[in-house]
Amino acid sequence: MKKFNCIVAGICLSASLASAETIEWSAGSLGGGWYTMSAGIAKIITSENQDIKIKVVPGGGTANPSKIQKNRSQIAMGLDTVSYLAVNAKGMYGKKHDKVSLIGQGLSDQILHVVRSKDAKYTNIADLLTKGEDKRIAINKVGSSDELVFRWIMEYYNTSYADLKKRGFKVVHGSYSEVASQFKDGLVEYAVVKLGVPGAAVIDMLLSRDGEVTTLPADLMSSLKKNWGYNSGTIKKDTYKGQNKDAVTGNMSTALIASTDLSVNTVYKITKAICENEDKLESIHSSMKFFSCKTATVDASIPVHPGAAKYYKEMGYIK
């Protein structure tokens, strides 16, 4: 009888595993923060849901929405602003990505830092771009999301790289460490980078040279939100040397996106597993320290997946 029960149990277990739903999760580059985060969260989900199997694969912020749309992946890491562009066929996306939906955002924040040296003439980016001449700016590499936001800012102020060049500006692009070196060595007066807070490159800049992180004008932020789904964020006073007041600026939030083809039940279980294990997220990656399911859909720039919405409604996080 025991042998029979064991055989039956084995058959049932095999049947259960065979019927498990396999989901591909597109992360970031191997060895990067997104890959580490994805692998860790996937482990939490599968440990609590034996009927879900997750395969984590490399991906990227701009590529992941298209992988979801084409059903190459069913879950992916993303940036809230980039996801908004994909869903609304803006920027680099020529077609609406109508299969892209949100599970939650705020996993980690990427805050825009517009840094000025203490002796720089202009105290805000509006005056710099509309009145400035012969100024020097260092920005992250062309094609980066940092540089993309700078292009949006230039567009708002009716200027461009070509126009700045005519006015004697020198704009240099490079890695975060190269931008920091340019600022520290006095080769530029302003630096534009998008980093988690506190950003190592900005710490380096402001420990070596007096300066501050500036606030973006409210009208600019309103336009960026309306046209590009770009949200605001705050760098608290005393975050950096010389930072004697809060700086309100732009924020791209790391989001977890999912295909609308995934069932309500599956995404509900995924959301539930994440939210009931929030206390484990920081140990996976320190940038997830402040993530909260209570605020995971605040300022959502794309539709929330019905499965995630079902869980959030049950918990009273959304109406």
Q: Regions from the language model: what does each represent?
A:
Residues 22-48, 52-55, 111-185, 294, ...:
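Bilobed "Venus flytrap"/periplasmic-binding protein-like clamshell domains
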